[in-house]
């Protein structure tokens, strides 16, 4: 199967996501100290970075631009990590953070910064970190 511009598309898409992440990260950096919803968004941005990086590796290996053994192992076994980072990290955690902000805004109530919400953030971040790191260790340890 010939995919003539897949690696170019992957690199352009990766560059686009990098610019978006950089733009949002600069905005968040200037807004320090971060409110709780912004911390959720920061975790989501880290997760989308992982998902995009894995997607680029998938495309580069599929077109045979990247042929290293580590890249091939990532291509063959890292799809669950890609899904966890994309759906669990980027979409879910970012949506939770935005929901915390929007709920307070539409109810005309003050922002809630309860211990329970911080525990939710730390639990979600820890679960994502363990899943992604453990997944990489498992994939790269394959012989």
Residues of each region from the PLM?
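Hydrophobic alpha-helical transmembrane segments of multi-pass integral membrane proteins
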Residues: 1-143
